């Protein structure tokens, strides 16, 4: 028996200012899939990920998400301004009592959840966004440029976590490494 896909895009087309971003795009994401979208800046990778996340409506085509599928989206530059600390941001989507998941990820990522958002560096903000996504443990992870602003130690942690996860994931990069 064939497995139901977590997410399916069928005939997706999108234009910006009359210019096609993509046309008649089809994509099927199955449980456990690992997909990398690699391309030059401005080629539509982040826009496609927003369509996958359900945050951008295509001009044409269908986005189908299997009912009950948890999707986590790590955007390229999340707005943390509504939060006092990095830990507040990282735990915001978790049910009460599940905050320990952020602490576990924070330990691996070597970031301090009590760090005020106002004084956090780009790398610290990125680590908080990763901790949030990993703490959510969704069935499908959408990661837009997850290694931006990270040092080698954090990148190696991310690689190990992604290598061990059972979640499917789509990762965007403009770096072929």
Kindly give the residue locations of the regions a language model identified.
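ABC ATP-binding cassette signature C-motif
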Residues: 1-177
